[in-house]
Amino acid sequence: MNKHGAQNTGKTIKRILSYMKKYKFRFIFVLICILLSAVANVAGSMFIGTLIDDYITPLLGSTNPVFTGLLKAICVMGIVYLVGILATLFYNRTMVSIAQGVLKKIRDDMFTHMQKLPIKHFDTHTHGDIMSYYTNDTDTLRQMMAQSIPQMFSSAVTIISVVVAMFISNVYLAIFVLVFATCMMFVTKKIAGASGRFFVKQQQSIGKVNGYIEEMINGQKVVKVFCHEEHSKEDFDKINEELCENATEANKYANILMPIMANLGNLQYVLIAIIGGALALNGVAGLTLGVIASFLQLSKSFTMPINQISQQLNSIVMALAGAERIFNLMDEEVEQDNGDVTLVNVKYDRNDNIVETEEKTYMWAWKEVQKDGSVKYTRLTGEVKFFDVDFGYNPEKIVLHDITLYADHGEKVAFVGATGAGKTTITNLINRFYDIADGTITYDGININRIKKKDLRRSLGIVLQDTNLFTGTIKENIRYGNLDATDEEVYAAARLANADEFINMLPDGYDTVISGDGGSLSQGQRQLLSIARAAVADPPVMILDEATSSIDTRTEAIVQRGMDALMTGRTVFVIAHRLSTVRNSDVIMVLELGRIIERGNHEQLISQKGKYYQLYTGAFELE
């Protein structure tokens, strides 16, 4: 392992230990139990010599043997082993509870951090790869903490205890065992080091496979429609082959470790018997049959934990690879928010001044704290303006050029243009999912960079073509737009969105449970719920991103009525593939290659006979 890799591993271990600090008293209990287990194991091995020399050998050839002493000795030996068994049981159960507690905290922290990541992260990472952090990577950590760590501690304590016992029994044999063990440890280090690199690659490959499978499951209809089954299989085979190669290399070394260690242990056992027998026959060091038997048992107790350590090293290396991926995710830079302007609930006092209130007034204002400490309230109206805005997802490649537009309170602004023209990008900038490269965007006259992102997004509503529904009831999905909404407000939002009729036809009405992203509902019904969710939030600004481009004409009419009701009195930005949905807009912006090439209302643009006219008359298709 190179220096950089060792440093990363050290940091990863420190971070794992930081999560374990909370359970230090349980760890003390675990250590005590491990000590008891190890001492009981060694004491049992040592007692075998006493049993043979003091209780069994004297009975050999005796004409009137008395077994009372032997039976008592066997009972004592049984009690010693019972203590060891109970201690092992207790520390294993305790470590399982510690492991689950640590993993819960890691998952909580990981999810909390993930919620703070910018949209860019999710745009550049597959969902399956992100999911593998919560499944494969955390599972390897669970195995390490619940099994590998206690086993390693137990093995280490057992090795120390056995070494002390062996030196007490016979110094010569003890030295031989230590020399032999050094050779075994050298072999273990070499093999574990070789497999470690590939375990890291294996975890990365698992993430890629999960990501590809997730994409294929979500896009299965598209795959079948375009008959890309074979092409998809070929792509999967390539990714799967990469996983196979990395897993093979990792486990090739890992799987030969145990057989090698086991055979070396057997060889050591035979050599101890030969050397011990030779020393006993020559009367060296007072070796007896009982001492040799004890030593043979101690050698097993010595090689077994070494084998266990070598076995657990594979799990630990894999777990550290998974933990490194998790901590890399948690080290990703979170979405920056330096805004100081907040959105507050307000009302008019007796002097018609705007004042902040805890009451639910449905009246909002931007709260700005001035340099002199005074507070300025700006009534939330939904006026959005772009001034000479440039933007690029990559700083070196600008995709929006010199965008200037004005949307006054209650105006409907529509964006039309081919795919990739920049329509959705503009709405992403209003939400501050991405920050602009140059220019200014204002909301009610305030630079949106000064507004806290949470408050900015709270004032915006969005209805997407691809509606995301969550597992839960219809009512809960609508209330997702405003968690403080009452049942009556939910019902009112559904009626406004024209969703009330179909909801009441469901088996349990508003309490009908949907799952699997609402797969049992039609596309139109899903969009009606999305409109209702936006309605219950009651935002002054609405973004309708291609909201009716994938449903039939009849359903579109129902959805359109819901959207028309939702748009009343609000500033609205519309992106649609059907020009019929934008012709009644106050302003229509025609985009091409990231630039606004035409602007005006429907009649004005038709009279200009430019790009919009060509799109509207069918000379060009609107993509």
Report residues per predicted region.
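Juxtamembrane helix-loop junctions of ABC transporter transmembrane domains
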Residues: 2-9, 32-33, 40-56, 80-127, ...
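A short amphipathic helical element positioned immediately N-terminal to and/or at the very start
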Residues: 9-24, 130
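Transmembrane helix-loop-helix hairpins at lipid-water interfaces of multipass membrane proteins
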Residues: 27-90, 167-172, 283-289
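Hydrophobic alpha-helical transmembrane segments of ABC transporter permease domains
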Residues: 32, 87, 91, 99, ...
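ABC-type nucleotide-binding domain
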Residues: 63, 346-623
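An intracellular "coupling" helix at the cytosolic face of ABC transporter transmembrane type-1 domains
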Residues: 119-120, 136-145, 149, 153, ...
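Helix-loop-helix
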Residues: 165-179, 249, 253-324, 329-330, ...
